[in-house]
């Protein structure tokens, strides 16, 4: 089989640009999500946007619009249930996301439409259109900029919320900002890895970075780098193997984590300390 320059194809160019934009945003967020123990929240939002996607399709709206609405609804509902203190926080999250995900599957099964369920669940980067790519960039770029600008405040929030209040900042405002950013990141990752695997982009890069360094300032460039490299490998692999792009990205992330974990285990006393000394 002769070598083919995959960059000569417009659909591959769109896939790579969309994938990189998504990886950078999710990679940044992953640092705080994993440190604050918000992995389940990310999983909840990613599953809860399914009915929004179906409803948006029925109304002739972009998928991202419906997904964003239900992502924000999920954040609000989980917050209200947690405030009631009647049920445990993890229970509240589980109830909300399973209910919405079930609603989405019912809508897909009962409402006549041309929705490709596999594309929603596992993503379809190779089928991204120019408007889709521009939507991801327009949403992702402001999020990335704001996260970088607020990284010190968010890092302080993740380590010591009491200190945040002591210096006059609002923990509620910062938490709300992070939740909205999380919702938006999951919405744009719908194009890349779909509903089910979007959580992998939000958890694995940060977990890998945490194995390599204990300092957040290093994690904030290592995590997006790992996410970006994994997306590039996943997209390339999906093209040559004719496999699911979302599945290949998720698999690549898993392999990268395993490699770093094994190396960390074998070189426990030296691996990762080089960065932390600088």
Residue ranges and their predicted role:
Residues 1-24, 273, 277:
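Membrane-interfacial amphipathic/re-entrant helices at transmembrane-helix boundaries
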Residues 2-10, 24-35, 52-62, 153-163, ...:
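Short juxtamembrane and helix-loop transition motifs at transmembrane-helix boundaries
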Residues 2-14, 85, 89-153, 180:
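Transmembrane helix-bundle core of multi-pass membrane transporters
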Residues 15-18, 63-71, 90-94, 137, ...:
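Loop-to-transmembrane alpha-helix initiation sites
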Residues 31-113, 209-221, 238-241, 264-266:
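Short loop segments and helix-boundary regions at transmembrane helix junctions
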Residues 133-205:
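Helix-loop-helix "hairpin" substructures at the membrane interface of multi-pass membrane proteins
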Residues 196-247:
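Transmembrane alpha-helical segments in multi-pass inner-membrane proteins
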Residues 246-250, 254-278:
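Cytosolic-side transmembrane-helix boundaries in multi-pass membrane proteins
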């Amino acid at each position: 089989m002769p070598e083919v320059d995959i960059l000569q194809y417009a659909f591959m160019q769109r896939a790579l640009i969309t994938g990189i934009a998504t990886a950078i945003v999710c990679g940044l967020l992953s640092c705080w999500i994993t440190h604050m123990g918000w992995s389940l929240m990310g999983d909840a939002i990613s599953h809860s946007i399914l009915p929004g996607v179906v409803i948006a399709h029925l109304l002739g709206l972009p998928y991202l619009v419906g997904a964003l609405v239900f992502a924000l609804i999920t954040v609000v509902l989980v917050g209200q249930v947690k405030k009631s203190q009647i049920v445990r926080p993890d229970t509240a999250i589980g109830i909300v996301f399973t209910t919405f995900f079930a609603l989405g599957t019912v809508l897909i099964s009962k409402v006549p439409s041309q929705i490709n369920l596999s594309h929603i669940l596992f993503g379809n980067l190779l089928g991204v259109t120019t408007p889709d790519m521009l939507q991801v960039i327009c949403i992702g770029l402001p999020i990335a900029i704001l996260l970088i600008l607020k990284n010190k405040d968010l890092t302080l929030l993740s380590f010591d919320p009491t200190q945040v209040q002591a210096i006059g900042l609002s923990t509620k405002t910062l938490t709300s900002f992070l939740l909205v950013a999380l919702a938006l990141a999951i919405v744009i990752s719908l194009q890349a890895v779909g509903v089910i695997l979007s959580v992998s982009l939000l958890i694995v890069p940060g977990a890998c970075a945490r194995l390599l360094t204990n300092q957040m300032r290093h994690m904030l460039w290592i995590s997006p780098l790992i996410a970006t490299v994994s997306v590039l490998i996943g997209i390339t692999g999906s093209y040559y193997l004719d496999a699911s792009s979302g599945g290949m990205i998720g698999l690549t992330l898993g392999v990268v984590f395993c490699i770093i974990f094994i190396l960390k285990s074998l070189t426990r006393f030296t691996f990762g300390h080089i960065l932390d000394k600088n």
